[in-house]
Structures are given as structure tokens and as C-alpha cells.
């Protein structure tokens, strides 16, 4: 009978209704994903233009696989490579690729702390992310031990940043706020340290012995051509 029909009859919900609903939802999700992709692609062009005006190179990767390919194109085989706690590099598969390939990857976890630090300064390539980047190409990084920001500033011959589009901010003020109120509290959780931001999720401008906000580095220009390369990834990666 019509009353027991699984089809759409007089507003009843049946198997075909649920299937059609799922299809509509899937379509909306795909449309939303495409709009996000287009927005990120357009925004990335602005960021890359800003980077170029600051004597830095920028690239846009549609996904993690494209980001990995771009990164490997920038790293000659045989290179000595160091890293500054870059979760984003791991997320795109770059660390595994380097360990499996013809590269000399400096694993600081297997070295004396001081020896690992000094080896990183003399590396051919230094991998990092940014805690935030402005739409006109200025990068913000916060560091506790300061090994990461010091290698970004000088030492390694080339620095490659892997940056998710989730880290792009309108201006320097919002980039600083993101670094302090998003990246720092998450990293405090990651390192399991005793800071107010770990407990509350926001910055208290603390002077805790465990604070990871010891050094702030704003990278607004590169004096050395071809040293700084930024790969913008159309994905939510890193902190």
C-alpha cells in the first residue's frame, strides 16, 4: 500500500528519501570543498606575490602529495637536511621520503643535543613551518629553545617552509595572535609543559620557566636570494 511504500509519498521518509538526502549532502560537501579550494588558490597567489616582493620564493600545492613533490624538487640528492620540529613536514610524508632516499637527514633525537644543534646550522637544507604567515608574505615564529628561529635567521644554506593555508592571517597583528593563542597552547600540550596556556588554551604572556614563547622571529625579507622557499599547502596541517 501507499502507506507502507519506501518511496517519497506525501512527505514520508523511506529508503529512496535517505539515499537522495545523502546524495544532496555529498553534493553540498563537494561544492563547499571546491569553494574552499578556489579561495585558498586565490589567497595563495596573493601570499606568493608578497613573498616574491620580499625576495622569497613561494609555491602552491593542491594537496599533500603535491606539496611533497614540490619539496623534493627543492632538495638535491645527497643534501644534508635538518629540521626544527616541523610537524607539517611529517604530515606530507617528507620525513619518511628523506629517510628512505639518498639524503643525509640529521635526526637530532639520536644525537647529543649540542652536536645536533651545531650540525643543523651547517646543513644544506633546513625544514620548518611557520606559526603564522600574513597575506602579504610575512612569517611569524615563536620558539622556546630558539634552535628553530636561529636556523631560520641564519646558518643553513636553504630554508624550506611547509605551511598549511590554515595559517594564513590578514596582517601581522593577527599573525602574532595566532602564533600565541593557537600554535603555542597546542605545542604546550604536545610537549606536556607547565604553562598557563596549556591549561586554558590561550596566551597569558607568562614568564613560566617552561614558557615556549622565549623568542619571536618575524621574517619580512630575505637578504639572500634563493634561500627561503615557502610551500603553501591547500590543507589544514600543522599548528
Question: What are the roles of these predicted feature ranges?
Answer:
Residues 8-11, 17:
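Short N-terminal alpha-helical targeting/association segments
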Residues 15-31:
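Short, Lys/Arg-enriched N-terminal segments with co-localized hydrophobic residues
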Residues 40-127:
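N-terminal active-site beta-alpha-beta segment that forms phosphate/nucleotide-binding
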Residues 5-7, 21:
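Cysteine-centered motifs
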Residues 121-239:
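Conserved phosphate- and dinucleotide-binding cores of soluble alpha/beta proteins
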Residues 27-53, 59, 79, 118, ...:
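SAM-dependent methyltransferases
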Amino acid at each position: 500500500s501507499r502507506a507502507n511504500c519506501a518511496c517519497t509519498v506525501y512527505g514520508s521518509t523511506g529508503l529512496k528519501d535517505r539515499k537522495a538526502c545523502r546524495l544532496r549532502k555529498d553534493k553540498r560537501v563537494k561544492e563547499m570543498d571546491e569553494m574552499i579550494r578556489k579561495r585558498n588558490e586565490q589567497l595563495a597567489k596573493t601570499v606568493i606575490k608578497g613573498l616574491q616582493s620580499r625576495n622569497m620564493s613561494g609555491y602552491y600545492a593542491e594537496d599533500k602529495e603535491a606539496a611533497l613533490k614540490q619539496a623534493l624538487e627543492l632538495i638535491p640528492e645527497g643534501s644534508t637536511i635538518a629540521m626544527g620540529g616541523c610537524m607539517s613536514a611529517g604530515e606530507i610524508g617528507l620525513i619518511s621520503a628523506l629517510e628512505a632516499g639518498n639524503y643525509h637527514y640529521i635526526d637530532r633525537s639520536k644525537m647529543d643535543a649540542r652536536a645536533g644543534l651545531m650540525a643543523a646550522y651547517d646543513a644544506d637544507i633546513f625544514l620548518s613551518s611557520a606559526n603564522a604567515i600574513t597575506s602579504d608574505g610575512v612569517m611569524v615564529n615563536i620558539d622556546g629553545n630558539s634552535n628553530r628561529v636561529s636556523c631560520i635567521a641564519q646558518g643553513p644554506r636553504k630554508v624550506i617552509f611547509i605551511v598549511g593555508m590554515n595559517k594564513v592571517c590578514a596582517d601581522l597583528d593577527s599573525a602574532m595572535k595566532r602564533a600565541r593563542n593557537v600554535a603555542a597552547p597546542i605545542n604546550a600540550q604536545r610537549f606536556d609543559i607547565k604553562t598557563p596556556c596549556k591549561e586554558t588554551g590561550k596566551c597569558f604572556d607568562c614568564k613560566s620557566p617552561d614558557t615556549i614563547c622565549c623568542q619571536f622571529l618575524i621574517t619580512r625579507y630575505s637578504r639572500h636570494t634563493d634561500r627561503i622557499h615557502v610551500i603553501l599547502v591547500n590543507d589544514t596541517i600543522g599548528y
